[in-house]
């Protein structure tokens, strides 16, 4: 049994889960992206995929990994890699390591929180909204367009609208204001998502397996994640049972053992769902409310890791060349 963490060793959610796993006494290793130039991956392919990860001070047999908690960033964006540039050996190495570990995470029989294929829906917000509607949540009227006149018509119809990223790339949700009219022409070069503004109270819901942690956010900013001068209050709360059940079912069907769900209850009491985050930075809410989200994730990883059998994925290093051997050293 071995639980593998992959991402930036300085990232708070990764630190929090790692601390809880150690408190449980669960065998845990970290693949720290900050040390990617000293990380090598070797994969062997036969009836399954196995191999080893070599770091500066460690060697990890992937056949022993029974659970994986992944929060990787694009390693090519790390300062040392970005400075070296796309044509450098450092860049090629970083991209290769990322690709190989992501590929392995899709094929391993180990528990993965969360698999890349399950997280993919977040790369298309309109597609994800269609999934959300199936679970009885209201969704705002939405326009995805490169037509400035269509955007203007949509704005005039709803009176108040917001604009946001179409993809998984983070953006600050903002309301369209009169001074933005001169910029509407820019959408011709950038597909932009516009949504009907829904007045009401914000809720963030974290689902961990079957556990649900909800909190209410009070803030007058368009996007409470970037409140500016607006005060913000976050408090733990309990959702109506049917809303809690829908959140749990939504995460389950989307195959996301850990998910962050953004809700808003409008002034008439209807529940709107804006999106499902497949890799939530839950520590922001945990620190504000004291909710034991990192503990729940650690317990889920450890509990499922104990029942996972990956023994059939073992490969001997001397046998790899008969199958497929891939490794890169800068």
Model-derived segments and spans:
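Extreme N-terminal starter segment of soluble prokaryotic enzymes
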Residues: 1-4
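Conserved N-proximal alpha/beta basic substrate-recognition cap immediately N-terminal to
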Residues: 8-20, 29-138
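Phosphate-binding site of ATP-dependent enzymes
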Residues: 21, 154-244, 250
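Short acidic-glycine loop/turn motifs at beta-strand connectors
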Residues: 45-47, 56, 207-211, 266-269
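Loop-centered beta-sheet repeat module
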Residues: 121, 125-172
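Protein kinase-like catalytic core scaffold
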Residues: 161, 213, 259, 272-274
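A long amphipathic alpha-helix within ATP-dependent nucleotide-binding catalytic cores
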Residues: 224-271, 294-305, 309, 317-329
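Glycine-rich phosphate/pyrophosphate-binding beta-alpha loops
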Residues: 277-289
């Amino acid at each position: 049994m071995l639980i593998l963490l992959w991402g930036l060793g300085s990232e708070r959610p990764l630190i929090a889960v790692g601390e809880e796993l150690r408190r449980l006494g669960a065998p845990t290793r970290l693949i720290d992206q900050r040390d990617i130039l000293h990380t090598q991956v070797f994969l062997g392919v036969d009836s399954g995929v196995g191999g080893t990860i070599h770091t500066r001070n460690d060697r990890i047999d992937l056949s022993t990994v029974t659970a994986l908690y992944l929060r990787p960033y694009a390693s090519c964006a790390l300062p040392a890699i970005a400075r070296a540039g796309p044509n450098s050996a450092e860049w090629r190495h970083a991209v290769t390591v990322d690709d190989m570990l992501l590929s392995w995470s899709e094929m391993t029989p180990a528990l993965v929180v969360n698999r890349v294929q399950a997280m993919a829906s977040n790369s298309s917000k309109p597609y994800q909204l269609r999934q959300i509607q199936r679970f009885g949540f209201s969704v705002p009227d939405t326009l995805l367009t490169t037509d400035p006149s269509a955007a203007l018509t949509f704005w005039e119809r709803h009176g108040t609208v917001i604009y946001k990223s179409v993809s998984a790339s983070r953006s600050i949700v903002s309301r369209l204001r009169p001074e933005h009219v001169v910029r509407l022409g820019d959408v011709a070069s950038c597909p932009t998502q516009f949504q009907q503004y829904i007045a009401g109270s914000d809720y963030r819901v974290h689902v961990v397996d079957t556990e649900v942690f909800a909190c209410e956010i009070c803030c007058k900013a368009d996007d409470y994640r970037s409140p500016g001068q607006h005060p913000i209050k976050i408090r733990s709360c309990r959702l109506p049972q049917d809303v809690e059940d829908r959140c749990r079912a939504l995460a389950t069907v989307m195959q996301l053992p850990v998910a962050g769900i953004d809700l808003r209850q409008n002034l008439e009491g209807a529940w709107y769902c804006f999106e499902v985050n497949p890799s939530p930075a839950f520590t922001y809410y945990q620190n504000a409310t004291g909710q034991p989200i990192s503990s729940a994730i650690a317990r889920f990883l450890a509990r499922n890791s104990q029942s996972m059998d990956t023994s059939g994925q073992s490969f001997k290093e001397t046998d790899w060349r008969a199958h497929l051997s891939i490794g890169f050293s800068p």
